[in-house]
């Protein structure tokens, strides 16, 4: 998918780029698959900020995506390719033979009129088809991967994302995840064949502050520009270094310090992610 650039008629437009939308075939047509979601803006149930630099962004409706792919044995046809304001990839509206309609994440190469299906096994290895991991050949690129059977996909859902099946071991399948981590996942978990579309999204340049605000991203203030009460790096006369190793606003080391907690599923990690 191409990236569109602009003539530098303003300083912001000089480097700004947007995704080409020629692949989008329709606006949302199934009202039952659109719901309102109240924006948390990074606040918890007490109204306190728990995730900084977030806001509601532009007004939008959430599209209900079929992450479980549990409609077995019924063939579906891709009716439309649509924009989703909540994610950086495109979504497809799939119309099934029994009249049901569901949204799925668009794999690269899937277009209007193509057929997709979900089953435990026995399907062709084509983009958009979903099967259990144990029944997909070694070396295949997959996305929309479940971590727990029946819970719904949690891994490789962003634009250009995929994991590769590296092998099998007892009831597990070994996957190389987008982060580079090698991990064992139960073979009965569902996954979709192919790579998530809109791969060029990573090359898009936001270009201006207002566009970030539309995306729900607030400005970040440097700790060294704050007062000592607000950040460990704050204070001093003029521009000074903090006099200590870089830390978070709460005093935890911020470069290279491991914060991941141990849990039972760590035993399924064969090799850790790349640095």
UniProtKB/Swiss-Prot annotation:
Any one GO molecular function term: transferase activity
Superkingdom of the source species: Bacteria
Compositionally biased spans, kind Basic residues: 257-275
GO biological process: cytoplasmic translation
Gene3D superfamilies for the chain: 2.30.30.30, Nucleic acid-binding proteins (2.40.50.140), Ribosomal protein L2, domain 3 (4.10.950.10)
Keyword Magnesium among UniProt keywords: no
CC terms in the record's Gene Ontology section: large ribosomal subunit
Database matches in PROSITE patterns: RIBOSOMAL_L2
Region of interest called Disordered, as start-end residue ranges on this chain: 216-275
Function of the molecule: One of the primary rRNA binding proteins. Required for association of the 30S and 50S subunits to form the 70S ribosome, for tRNA binding and peptide bond formation. It has been suggested to have peptidyltransferase activity; this is somewhat controversial. Makes several contacts with the 16S rRNA in the 70S ribosome.
Name of the molecule in the record: Large ribosomal subunit protein uL2
Natural source organism: Aliarcobacter butzleri (strain RM4018) (Arcobacter butzleri)
Lineage of the organism: Bacteria, Pseudomonadati, Campylobacterota, Epsilonproteobacteria, Campylobacterales
Gene for this chain: rplB
């Amino acid at each position: 998918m191409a990236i569109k650039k602009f003539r530098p008629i303003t300083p912001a437009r000089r480097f700004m780029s947007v995704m080409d939308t020629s692949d989008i075939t329709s606006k949302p047509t199934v009202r039952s698959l659109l719901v309102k979601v109240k924006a948390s803006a990074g606040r918890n149930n007490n109204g306190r900020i728990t995730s900084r630099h977030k806001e509601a962004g532009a007004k939008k409706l959430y599209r209900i995506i079929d992450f479980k792919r549990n409609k077995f044995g019924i063939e579906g046809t891709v009716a439309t390719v649509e924009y989703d304001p909540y994610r950086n990839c495109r979504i497809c509206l799939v119309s099934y033979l029994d009249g049901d309609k569901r949204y799925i994440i668009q794999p690269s190469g899937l277009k209007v009129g193509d057929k997709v299906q979900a089953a435990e096994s026995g399907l062709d290895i084509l983009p958009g088809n979903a099967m259990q991991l144990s029944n997909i050949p070694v070396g295949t690129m997959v996305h929309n991967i479940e971590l727990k059977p029946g819970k719904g996909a949690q891994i490789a859902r962003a634009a250009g994302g995929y994991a590769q099946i590296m092998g099998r071991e007892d009831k597990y399948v070994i996957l190389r995840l987008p982060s580079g981590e090698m991990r064992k996942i139960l073979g009965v978990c569902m996954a979709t064949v192919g790579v998530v579309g809109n791969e060029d999204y990573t090359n898009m340049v936001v270009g201006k502050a207002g566009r970030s605000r539309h995306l729900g991203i607030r400005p970040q203030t440097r700790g060294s520009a704050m007062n000592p009460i607000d950040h460990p790096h704050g204070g001093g006369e003029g521009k000074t270094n903090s006099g200590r190793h870089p830390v978070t606003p709460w005093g935890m080391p911020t470069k290279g310090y491991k914060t991941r907690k141990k849990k039972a599923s760590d035993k399924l990690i064969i090799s850790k992610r790349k640095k």
